[in-house]
């Protein structure tokens, strides 16, 4: 699962938002959309590379991402072993605030753009139906807001360390649970997301998700639904 954190407010606030996420894949396998991965059914042959993409939208933002992963060594993606992953994302968002003028503070609407790249290395553990992945790497992010918001520190370009953990549990052939968390030092962004999914077919799944996310400027909650296409 991959989730970007946007700077939506000039002052720290708490917020609950709802949205819909659509994820899909091309190539050999699918990886679910805060750079998060997914799993596949064990009866399929395990490939060594994967390509994934996704899109999500809410009331004040929309974002998309693309990425790829590779399993090092002789084992495939669904077996224990070392992993490499690269992800790029782009998003646009809008929020309301205020600007200081000669006549005092006046209401203003800010439009933001966020571009993000990350390169990670990690290891996948597998015990029965449970898969756990641990990643670490570097991230680069650029936040651009128009007009410039002097009250928002999440602007400009930054490099940082990224840490990430992913878990996936097949409850049954139809149902699965996932729980993921990440933290990046570029703008001190964090994300934690849990999902309950239902496989309608081998190529289509849907379900519910909820979690928390934020950065050095704001904290928020998220609840919504998702669709997954293999």
What residue spans do the PLM features occupy?
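Outer-membrane pore/translocation modules
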Residues: 78-189, 210
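Intrinsically disordered, low-complexity regions
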Residues: 11, 20, 25-28, 38-39, ...
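Cleavable N-terminal export/targeting peptides
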Residues: 1-48
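Short glycine/proline- and aromatic-enriched beta-strand/turn motifs that initiate or cap beta-hairpins
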Residues: 38-103
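Transmembrane beta-strand segments that form the barrel wall of outer-membrane beta-barrel proteins
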Residues: 47-58, 136, 140, 173-185, ...
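A broadly tuned "polar low-complexity/structure-edge" signature
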Residues: 2-9, 59-69, 89-92, 218-220, ...
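Feature captures outer-membrane beta-barrel proteins of Gram-negative bacteria and organelles
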Residues: 43-44, 64-79, 117-124, 153-171, ...
């Amino acid at each position: 699962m991959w989730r970007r954190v946007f700077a939506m407010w000039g002052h720290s606030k708490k917020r609950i938002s709802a949205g819909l996420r659509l994820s899909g894949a091309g190539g050999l396998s699918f990886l679910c959309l805060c750079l998060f991965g997914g799993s596949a059914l064990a009866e399929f042959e395990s490939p060594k590379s994967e390509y994934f993409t996704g899109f999500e939208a809410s009331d004040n933002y929309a974002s998309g991402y693309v990425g790829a992963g590779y399993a090092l060594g002789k084992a495939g993606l669904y077996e224990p072993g070392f992993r490499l992953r690269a992800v790029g994302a782009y998003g646009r968002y809008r929020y309301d605030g205020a600007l200081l003028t000669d006549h005092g503070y006046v209401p203003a609407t800010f439009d933001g753009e966020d571009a993000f790249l990350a390169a990670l290395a990690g290891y996948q553990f597998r015990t029965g139906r449970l898969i756990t992945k641990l990643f670490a790497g570097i991230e680069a992010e650029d936040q651009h807001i128009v007009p410039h918001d002097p009250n928002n520190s999440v602007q400009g370009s930054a490099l940082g360390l990224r840490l990430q953990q992913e878990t996936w549990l097949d409850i049954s052939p139809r149902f699965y649970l996932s729980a993921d968390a990440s933290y990046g030092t570029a703008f001190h962004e964090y994300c934690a997301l849990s999902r309950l999914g239902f496989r309608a077919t081998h190529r289509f799944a849907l379900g519910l998700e909820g979690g928390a996310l934020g950065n050095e400027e704001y904290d928020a909650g998220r609840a919504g639904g998702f669709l997954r296409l293999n």
